[in-house]
Amino acid sequence: MNIKYSEKSIKDLKSFSHPDRILIAKKIEYLSENFEILKSSKKVTELKDCEFKNQFRFIIAKKIRVLFKIENSEITLLVLRVGLRKSIY
């Protein structure tokens, strides 16, 4: 599965320390390789609000979340936001 980052997610990533950015990048790569398995776990959940239709949340660490969506035509994981749990939604 290909990975694309939105401009907002790139800006979000820059706010993290270098070790955190490495962790986040590794977890996003893991997500792209194991999406179907993670979808059946509690680590990946679909967001339910109308504003977030067809978007998912992935838990990276205790307080770090990634919001993303799957684009059907190319099976691409588009990372929309990366941030702390309290401020990402």
Name the predicted role of every residue range.
Residues 2, 7, 11-15, 22, ...:
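Enriched for short, Lys/Arg-rich terminal
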Residues 9-42:
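N-terminal first-folded block
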Residues 32-58:
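A short, surface-exposed loop/turn module that caps and links secondary-structure elements
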Residues 25, 41, 55, 74-76:
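A structure-centric signal for secondary-structure junctions around beta-strands
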